[in-house]
Swiss-Prot record:
GO molecular function: acetyl-CoA C-acyltransferase activity
Keywords attached to this entry: Acyltransferase, Cytoplasm, Fatty acid metabolism, Lipid degradation, Lipid metabolism, Transferase
Role description: Catalyzes the final step of fatty acid oxidation in which acetyl-CoA is released and the CoA ester of a fatty acid two carbons shorter is formed.
Quaternary structure and partners: Heterotetramer of two alpha chains (FadJ) and two beta chains (FadI).
Family: Belongs to the thiolase-like superfamily. Thiolase family.
Any one Pfam family match given in the protein's UniProt record, by short name: Thiolase_N
SUPFAM superfamilies assigned: Thiolase-like
Record's protein name: 3-ketoacyl-CoA thiolase
Amino acid sequence: MRQALPLVTRQGDRIAIVSGLRTPFARQATAFHGIPAVDLGKMVVGELLARSEIPADAIEQLVFGQVVQMPEAPNIAREIVLGTGMNVHTGAYSVSRACATSFQAVANVAESLMAGTIRAGIAGGADSSSVLPIGVSKALARALVDVNKARTTRQRLTLFSRLRLRDLLPVPPAVAEYSTGLRMGDTAEQMAKTYGITREQQDALAHRSHQRAAQAWAEGKLAEEVMTTYVPPYKNPFAEDNNIRGTSTLADYAKLRPAFDRKHGSVTAANSTPLTDGAAAVILMTESRAKELGLRPLGYLRSYAFTAIDVWQDMLLGPAWSTPLALERAGLTMADLTLFDMHEAFAAQTLANLQLLGSERFAREVLGRAQATGEVDDAKFNVLGGSIAYGHPFAATGARMITQTLHELRRRGGGFGLVTACAAGGLGAAMVLEAE
């Protein structure tokens, strides 16, 4: 094992995660229909600051992400600063690492803290699958540029006359990988077949996720970390995630047809995460700054790791690659963890990663490591459910997982937790958290 890399400032301060908050997560075109991601981001950051009672000018940086970006607000981070009453001099920039975007935002703020350029910052992400950048065809886009440069009406009419009817149809955002043309669900199907993961196993994991998420809400475990929102026409509050199937039975999952490989597949809408709207954010500070402000941190960032692999096969194995690296940098092993939380993009992807984390062969032949990362104890795994139940607003999921894991660690008396996610483009992320 390589030497651990402590995440501390030049003065020896740990990176404290002071608080975290998210909106309820809403299925596409439901509670947040028509609400753009930038407004969701403003909601959560504004409420986070109000609850924390931290002076707005104490926040020196805001790093925020959005995967499905809107052309009219390309820097969502700066719009949030300007729309929440924060100090206009607060530095703000946007990041994107697909489904690991808020992991990246947290890492960036942590690096600024370690460099000593700031003492407090906010990281997070927001996405809306209900407000999408519907585009135009390449032919129409080119014609519009040429028309703008045309000097006469005749030239403009000539340019438009070259267009076909299909060129005028709207173009929705792509759901496939740009480099391969594969959808993430196609990769999930490939991984299910490659690693022998059955439909029954996938449905069982999805059912487990929903049952545990429903139980977490019923026991009041999420109330502190999820805000109540009000959206037009402001008649009813929206306070709880609306994707969770608390009353479903395992038999209900078997009724759905495969969504990607319709003849021989096993990946369905029920054992995959749904398209979702929502936002989440966390406040990070140096440990000494938190003490100055009289704040008790939720916990601390112990380590993080980002990885990248090939996109043609096993593209969603990011957790199996990034987890051992994050553990190594933290100076820990799988046995040291109190909690292990993995983003459930698909049940097939989740089960494949769990399988390979415990595989000696994968460790030796693929990772070049002497031994397996370690089996994940079911009693520590996604104990409050996961993304299949809560939903997955792409850029917000990491911040949800971090906040949720730290609160649960605190309820258990402290310890270490690891959060990890796969992401489009063969990317992976993992972070080790510590609570006292």
